[in-house]
């Protein structure tokens, strides 16, 4: 090393000191002043851990006055360098800048600058960086992205729907799985995919007030999505940050009532720019052609301004056929433009169902089937497709063609891509329902009060009287006052106490229609037998309800009984219990199904006992018999219940209003016959279509198997532990697939993404995570991994390295240069660029003659043959071959151009294939539905041309490099 006063050097071991200046030199030592950090260092001359900073032609450097110079020439005189070039701010040419006047705070951003400046990292960090780039790329390209990292069981039909919908641009769908099939999880998976891919950045979830907290917790626990609940208080607090409070958070959760009640809040929600709207319990959105409900109008206004919309309802035709059409109209007003046309189209489902069944069966297509398909797809030339099906070609190709025809049929002639509905009949693994009808004698106190109420209720409508007669305890209280203790003589209470005593170790869910009944029942159980119970009703706050639900769920020391009013049977799930008591009966079959669905859902491991105590000779007995014998609504799910009820509602109400069984037998017979007929119709037409479309068949099973195969990925485990080590996190193995991760004092950063201040317990095993709520399931999608990768890449970890290759087959001193380039298209995340051209790493391995050996030398196996070099020695090695490294980088820059072009071509082809498919679909739809807007077609064409331009302008940047020197020692 030769030193001269004024030379600029950088410390190999303390790179944060900035750029140093030689201020004193004697025979044995050199003194360097680091002005940026106001530090002085004295080094031994012969082995100083510092590196001379030199810049080259093409570099941009900064003067201590703040202006920059693009270097065109470098002159050395008396050991000092002078840079000549053009000022970037004034374009003045031939400007001279002596190295002494360089900025003290100079930063080396290019990996080659860092390498030459002695900022050399460890080789294990270089390997970590390359793996981070590779994994980031693979995750972006993974078609199952957003599905693998959720903390939920791998249930095929849920995965299929989420996969089908989640990868669409601006999905607009109605998720209408039957009660208990997991719509909330499906919605969460769709949101997760949309957010991860950048297709949705701002998401609004609108739910009934009672379900806000449940959604908040589900999104956070299962998907690591942190929503904010917005109410009046939160909106007022947010005014300091924005005029529109809904602009202050990206992921927002609020109740429908909240935005329906306030005109101002409603307008603010509509004005906020959402990418995705999710509405739960969408069957509350009533509509008819003359007068839509306020709730419907509110959601319609938001849906018109929002690209993606998910509506969730357990009962697609609940509240009538018109409301079902209206919900579909919210999603796709072009496809569902006229109610009468919709009704007419539904009548034509049968031939479509037959054609789909023929295609799905895999059997040879009959001429009739072919003619039917050709007629239904008249705008498409299907003959070539039939020829492929009948040829001796590969099974895979035939299967693809059959699937293409099925997709086209369903898209154009059914509710297609808009409605997904799975039924229990199609999903295996549900428990049996065991019904226990318990007739009981009517107490004289009730008989008297009911008789008097009948005499006094002369002006009451039949419906109001029928409703009243179902709840004798309420009638009794009206006469006796609030202090009346009906539960002292009601035989249902005595029976219930005995049931609970006999089943002390069972959790029992009790549902009553009224909140007052639920509260008094809890009091009776507590006072008479000291039974631990908790109540759940509409008068409680969300937090109080959550506490009640948690107390019931608690295994040790928890409540034996949870008593819910009717609202308790919407949205809350208690599949850990299998005992359901209906203290009274709801007025319609849909509510009955909702009640049973709290226990009878996916995840229920045992058969369900449904206990229905009723008072003989009252409306309760008549309704129980009609539900049981007319609909079999207790024994199995009843999708036809609403239609049967509407057909016979006048008769049912008249019978319930009198409380007499005259006319009950014929009503039961006619109801059972109609129910059977409707079920047969559903079996024939639309439901079979939807079943084929919604449960995914073998595709769904394959999807679940693929995701299961990625669980516990050993590459992920190794990468995560290596990442945590590099960042400086403490890891404590707790056994049973669990590791406790906590922040450490000497971390690379002050706080680690996704890691709480107090640390957390992690597992890589899905089964363990599902059984232990206190654990984080770590996957490639988890914020601790995603955030860690971002941290490594932005903090420059592993951007340079020097390694030794001990190989006597090569001459000692042979050089290899490993370069990692990244292809990056600068485009908005929403454009979908990440799907076709995410940041793409390209590895080159240049030998000393400028040949690229990367195809012959695989990274991991080569990395295992290398040995590390300490930083000081590495810096010396780099300095001794600086000229050769420059030459190899220049050669690599030429080689990389061909590789970039190939990446651009592949990305463009993939994008055009995907988007042309969508364009063709809309053009075909336009042929059968003139209401498809031209803008929709131009939107896709515009998107294709924009993406094509972004891909064409994709640039490459050298991200990291490693010098490898052959050694024989």
Curated annotation (Swiss-Prot):
Top-level enzyme category: hydrolase
GO MF, one annotated term: helicase activity
EC number(s) reported in the record: 3.6.4.-
Record-linked Pfam families: Helicase_C, RapA_C, SNF2-rel_dom, Tudor_1_RapA, Tudor_RapA
Residue span(s) of domain Helicase ATP-binding: 164-334
Keyword Manganese among UniProt keywords: no
Keyword line: Activator, ATP-binding, DNA-binding, Helicase, Hydrolase, Nucleotide-binding, Transcription, Transcription regulation
Gene3D superfamilies in UniProt: 2.30.30.140, 2.30.30.930, 3.30.360.80, 6.10.140.1500, 6.10.140.2230, P-loop containing nucleotide triphosphate hydrolases, Tandem AAA-ATPase domain
Membrane spanning stretches: none
One of the GO biological process terms: regulation of DNA-templated transcription
Motif (DEAH box): 280-283
Binding annotation for ATP: 177-184
SUPFAM superfamilies: P-loop containing nucleoside triphosphate hydrolases (SSF52540)
Domain of life where this protein originates: Bacteria
Family: Belongs to the SNF2/RAD54 helicase family. RapA subfamily.
Function: Transcription regulator that activates transcription by stimulating RNA polymerase (RNAP) recycling in case of stress conditions such as supercoiled DNA or high salt concentrations. Probably acts by releasing the RNAP, when it is trapped or immobilized on tightly supercoiled DNA. Does not activate transcription on linear DNA. Probably not involved in DNA repair.
Name of the protein this chain belongs to: RNA polymerase-associated protein RapA
Natural source organism: Aliivibrio salmonicida (strain LFI1238)
